[in-house]
Amino acid sequence: MRKNACMLENPISANQMYAPIARGKMVKSKKYNLWIEKNLPLVKEQMEVIESFPINLEIMILANHLWCMKHDSDNLVKPLIDLLVKAEIIPDDTSRYIENISVRYLYMPGPPTVRISYDFVE
C-alpha cells in the first residue's frame, strides 16, 4: 500500500520560522528547528519518497475554532513543505514538483493536528 499521507501535531506558522539577530539579519528560530527535528522522523516513517512528479499537495488542518481564527492557513504551508524537502520526500518546493496546494480546515477539539497528503497530477 502506498504511503502518501502523514499526520503531525501542533503545526508551526511561518511567522515563527525566523528570529532576528544583529542589524536586521534573520536566522531560523530555535522553535522552528526543534519542530523540524521532532517531526522529521515522523514524516520519514509515515510517507514514502515521491518519485513521480508533479503532485497535488493537500493540507488538512484539524483544529478548534479559536485556533483557526488565530492562524492564517497560508502561514502554515511553508514550514510543512520545508519539512517534506528536509525529509527528502520531495526534492524541492518549486512548481516543477508541486503543481497545486490546497489547504482546508476541519473542526476538531483538542490540540491542532495537520494531515499532509498528495496525489499525482494526471
What role is predicted for each listed range?
Residues 1-122:
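Acidic, proline/glycine-enriched N-terminal capping motif
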